[in-house]
Amino acid sequence: MLTGGCVVSVPNLSFDADKLWEEVERSKISSIVIVGDAFAKPMLESLNKAKEAGKPYDISSVMLIISSGVMWSSEVKKALLEHHDMMLMDTMGSTEGGMGASITSRAMPTETAKFRLNPGTVIVSDDGEEVEPGSGVMGKIGTSGLVPEGYYKDPVKSAETFKEFNGVRYSFPGDYATINEDGTINLLGRGSNCINTAGEKVYPEEVEEAIKLSESVYDCLVVGLDDEKFGQRVVAVVSLNKNSDISEQDLTDFTKTKISGYKAPKNILFVDEVKRAPNGKANYKWAKAEAIDKLS
């Protein structure tokens, strides 16, 4: 709308990838806005199915797909680009402000959850120091610029989120990341979702992405459950691709080849469908309740 374009929406209340691509063909859509793998995976499946049937969708008009809110894996991006060369923009931000972006095309492949920070964005450690590139230290992402004065009638949350650092007012919504030597960052996840197990911090999004690297896995959510020995233990709720079959132990072993062993789930629970919010965002409340119910 800001560039004078026309906004087109699909009529379904629930997401239907086939209807989306049909509308792209009909209206010659140039830009699509999605929410990570929750939308991108069904879109890819629809393209693959149509191509295998000998009736591929005409998506030549698409120049840009923009995503935010949910992790968009590099594997899915790469597979989408096999159907059509376009720009895939993965944006990182919150209600309080934009933080960074990652742009992928056939000529510019990128890694999952790797972003380049916007100007005026910093990463500050829990010790209150700016994180040095390449140090491996985790920190909270802060954005400056148009920073709100606070949340309406919530002084406690306002004080936690909006702070001064080196004389500049920043918004720290709670997202943690590490910064690489080249200035790009690896997003770890929201601190409020962090799982504390045996004295170590584990971010659900990092574990989810490792699990989803398995060809057998369609979707998953990771939560922390109370544990007498470890404080919390990592539990994954997983749905598999059609006609896929993998055991809990095999998937655990696979995950340990992608991330440190202490981050791997102590339990993997298989479900028919991983429930998400209508906008594709993670429903950790459902996942935790499902995990408690299955393990009780």
Descriptions of predicted regions:
Residues L2-G5, E22, I29-I34, L44-T110, ...:
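Gly/Ser/Thr-rich phosphate-binding loop
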Residues E22, D37, G93, S144, ...:
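AMP-binding/adenylate-forming catalytic core of the ANL superfamily
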Residues S61, D85, S216-D219, G261, ...:
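Glycine-centered tight turns that cap/initiate beta-strands
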Residues H83, V122-T143, I179-D182, S244-E248, ...:
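Conserved beta-loop-beta connector loops within the AMP-binding
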Residues M89-E96, A113-F115, V223-L225, L269:
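Beta-strand->loop->alpha-helix junctions that form or flank phosphate-binding loops
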Residues T110-R116, T161, G167-V168:
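Short Gly/Pro-enriched turn/cap motifs at secondary-structure boundaries
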